[in-house]
Amino acid sequence: MNIRATVLASFCLFAMPVLMLAQTDEIQVYDGEIAPPGIFNLMIHNNFTPKGRTVPDYPGAIIANHSYQVTAEWAYGVTPWFEQGLYMPVTSPYSSNYGSTINGFKIRELFARPNAHDHTFFYAANFEFSVNHHYWESRTITSEIRPIVGLHLHPWDFIYNPIVDTDYTGGLGNLQYNPSGRAAYNFNDRWALAAEEYDGFGPLHGFLPLSKQFHEVWATSDYSGSEFLGLSVETGVGYGLTTASDKWTLKLMLSRNLNVHPWRP
């Protein structure tokens, strides 16, 4: 094997365990809230990386540095405990190595304790099934399992999402552990400030060395109300703690219910 082939093989070996963090269509800690039955909701996720990783996480992947991701997340409240979601389209309006791309789509099912905001302890489970282009993920089909647990200790909220991701290779031991968490202070029923963390430890059968793990801390602000055309708004700035993380990332999430009166098929 020549030197170039050896280097490429080594790169793939170390990049593959973190490939599921190559890019993301959403940067969000789930709080167990779902759309009311019969209500459609649309959320637009905007993520921009002004200073990030400058090499692809696997051969052919979108480069994170200076990339901009936009995803439309459609949701429909089926019952008080079940919300059906669809992410489409998942796009990158800009990346340095591909320009503008459509990256795939994703279906999700979110099961939650009804009226989670009214309970001190709440819980939920989210399941996602993704179809990806090769530059977005190294595998065409990937999935996420996201348990959700949290406490409403007014005015504080504490939420943890112990997420596992899979590309359906390597069995249970190759599940990727990518948890996220959030601690929020609610000034009132409209405004909140929060600290968030997003992590990627690697496969369950053996976590990666710390330098190769993904760890970002975030400061976010949240608004929900009717002042801005009925929009709920979340903004945030994230800072990477390891060399495998993006140094700076920005996010903007805009969401709105699309109907007032419940609709049933």
Question: In which residue ranges do the predicted regions lie?
Answer:
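Cleavable N-terminal export/targeting peptides
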Residues: 1-26, 261-265
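Transmembrane beta-barrel domains of Gram-negative outer membranes and organellar outer membranes
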Residues: 22-265
